[in-house]
Amino acid sequence: GTLLQAARDVVHREIPMLGINLGTLGFLAEIDKTSIYTALDKLFADDYEIEERMMLTGTVWRGDKITGQDVALNDIVISRVGPPLRVIGFNNYVNDGYLNSYNADGIIIATPTGSTGYSLSCGGPIISPNAAMTVMTPIAPHTLNTRSIIFPEDDVITVELGEGRRQIQENGLASFDGDVEVPMSTGDRIVIKKASVSVKILKLNHLSFVEVLRQKMSNN
């Protein structure tokens, strides 16, 4: 979470970032704490590559008023707030066209970078970080025919908070990279699209995504 927060803080300054993994998987943080000095040597020798990672921007609307807006490197999650056994309804649109509606605990809209995070744990696909697409993954949907859907990066996704099965006012929130949260209520909608800014990530080991994926998965 530290690297995600830092990415949102520095993205407008176009400062390349280098992550040091002190946790578990760490797909973004390719350097572990035992390799810090080796990493510094490579930096000083200009032995690195810079990889661009797309971000999402989300705008929450209540009627014709904006109630919140932010960017995310990993994902934007729209989820319920309240009793743990209550699901809420979601109405989903793509480029102003109706897609589907279902009851669930939430919905994840993830970038290729975020596809190895929360979306993956909810059954979403792993997407190569240089792929030009986003993925929508439901969280515990109450239907058998709802699965992750991949969209081109330029598609605009709108998620509207519905009434759910109880047909009462529901409360939810939109979370940006698990950090900034914007409250939502029935009828509110969030419009999500590719951000005009991107994050620059330093790569030192020159490994392909497939090689990194194999290493991370074999160690966990």
Q: Where are the language model's segments positioned?
A:
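Gly/Ser/Thr-rich active-site loops/lids in small-molecule metabolic enzymes
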Residues: G97-A104, I109-N145
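A generic structural signal for short beta-strands and their flanking turns/coil linkers
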Residues: E52-L56, A72-N74, R86-F90, D105-I107, ...
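Short, acidic/small-residue loops that bind anionic groups at enzyme active sites
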Residues: R13-I31
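Catalytic core of DAGKc-family lipid kinases
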Residues: L25-D105
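Short glycine-rich anion-binding loops that position phosphate/pyrophosphate groups of nucleotides
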Residues: G1-T2, L25, T113-S115
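ATP/nucleoside-binding phosphotransfer catalytic cores, i.e., glycine-rich phosphate-binding loops
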Residues: I78-S79, G89, V94-Y98, R147-N220
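Short, well-ordered alpha-helical microsegments
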Residues: L3-L4, L144
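Short Gly/Thr/Asp-enriched flexible loops that form oxyanion-binding sites at enzyme active sites
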Residues: Q5-H12, S119-G123
